[in-house]
Each structure stands twice: as structure tokens, then as C-alpha cells.
């Protein structure tokens, strides 16, 4: 059976909490769009986690977590989250990242804060 959690608003709807509850029995959990500006807090046996990039499925050994091609992937945020789950000894992380993601790096977020666009040269 396929289950989808889709927001009808701009956030703060409880999607992360519902996704975490469903992830306990899921084979695959996919984050299909969005950026690191949104997030959800997960509290479990490993500790308290604020996830902005990783799907909730990372805490379940039977679940594959997928970061899909609609995600604006903030690399420093992803690395921080990966380091946090490793440091808290979350076992058996199965994570797949689409090769079609838009990768954001530090210079992208800095230019956005300054109100400037980044362009290729």
C-alpha cells in the first residue's frame, strides 16, 4: 500500500510527525520537494533531532530514506544532520539521494540573504 503525506498549506501542519508515525511500518520514505528552511522535530530512543533535509525514515533499520529530485538540497545542512545521526549511533541508515537534486552550497544561501541572485560565469 502506498501512503502519501502532502501539505495543503505552507507548513506547520504536522506533516513531519505524521510521516514519522507512518515510517515505522514503511519500506520507503521519500522527501520529494522543499528545502532546508522547513523542518520537523523527532524525539525517539536515540535523542531529539531537528530534521530539515533527511526524511523521517532514517531512524528505522527496515526503511530506505530517499531525498527526491524536487528537493533543494542544502549540502551543509545535510552533512550536519548526517553527522548528528552518526554521533547518536542511529543504526542501519539506508539513504538514497537523487542525482537530479538542486544542490545548494554556502554561497547560494549567503547570496539569497543579501537579496542577490547567483549566476554561472
What are these regions (language model features)?
Residues 1-121:
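Non-transmembrane, aqueous-exposed alpha-helical and coiled segments at domain scale
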